[in-house]
């Protein structure tokens, strides 16, 4: 893959064993594609086709998108894919190529909560962790966002590129979206280390579509054991 760069955003706050497992799975799925790791704390070099960069602002919802803009400008490929530290990606995810001048979102994903019964849950909602998009279109969207909000966007108004409610509230252009689905799902973990207050308080609810076992990732009760 020479036309895609993955941008890995991390606050370095997840369990050590999980971090090792996540790295192993990510590098396997990327299969040598360029990766930019943007971390809040210094990290040991990963080697290979990996660039390490320290984030230049404290943790916040707005900072997620400010760092994404930095990473998108560092990349030189036609496409970029967001990688988050609590999300697992199948190799197939990074092979997708949404329409140009659209923000792409993989809509085949499961949430897996680290509290309560181990079960996969699905909600029909675009998530930044599953974004794979035309790089220049992402830069255009985020430059407009931060030109309008030079000091950063308020947490209560911050959200994904291409979500109409978010962009209407920010008074910026509502961006075109190209939703796609892979055969194997992305898995996003919901945990008390997250930025979302509902997650930290373990009060966040999952969707009504649920499964105990899914292709490729296996049983929820087995996969959740890696988050430790």
Cite the ranges covered by each PLM segment.
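Short aromatic/hydrophobic "clamp" motif used to bind/position activated sugar donors
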Residues: 80
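Short, acidic, metal-binding catalytic loop of nucleotide-sugar glycosyltransferases
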Residues: 20-33
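Short catalytic/ligand-binding loop motif for oxyanion handling, primarily in non-cytosolic enzymes
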Residues: 15-17, 44-47, 89-92, 113-115, ...
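Conserved catalytic core of nucleotide-sugar-dependent glycosyltransferases
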Residues: 94-227
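N-proximal low-complexity "stem/linker" segments adjacent to membrane-targeting elements
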Residues: 1-21
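The conserved acidic donor/metal-binding loop of glycosyltransferases
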Residues: 84-88
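Active-site-proximal specificity loops/subdomain of glycosyltransferases
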Residues: 37-76, 93-95
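Short, flexible/disordered intra-domain loops and linkers
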Residues: 14-21, 54-62, 123
């Amino acid at each position: 893959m020479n036309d895609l760069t993955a941008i890995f955003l991390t606050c370095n706050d997840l369990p050590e064993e999980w971090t090792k497992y996540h790295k192993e799975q990510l590098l396997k799925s990327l299969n040598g594609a360029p990766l930019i790791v943007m971390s809040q704390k210094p990290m040991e070099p990963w080697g290979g086709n990996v660039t390490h960069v320290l984030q230049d602002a404290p943790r916040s919802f707005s900072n997620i998108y400010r760092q994404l803009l930095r990473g998108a400008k560092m990349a030189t490929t036609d496409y970029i894919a967001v990688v988050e530290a609590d999300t697992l990606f199948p190799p197939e995810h990074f092979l997708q190529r949404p329409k140009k001048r659209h923000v792409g979102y993989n809509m085949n994903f499961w949430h897996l909560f680290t509290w309560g019964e181990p079960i996969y849950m699905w909600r029909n909602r675009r998530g930044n962790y599953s974004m794979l998009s035309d790089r220049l279109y992402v830069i255009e969207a985020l430059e407009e966002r931060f030109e309008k909000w030079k000091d950063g966007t308020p947490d209560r108004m911050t959200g994904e590129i291409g979500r109409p409610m978010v962009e209407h509230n920010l008074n910026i252009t509502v961006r075109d979206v190209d939703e796609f689905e892979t055969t194997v799902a992305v898995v996003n973990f919901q945990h008390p280390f997250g930025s979302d207050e509902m997650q930290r308080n373990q009060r966040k609810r999952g969707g009504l579509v649920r499964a105990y076992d899914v292709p490729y990732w296996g049983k929820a009760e087995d996969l959740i054991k890696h988050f430790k």
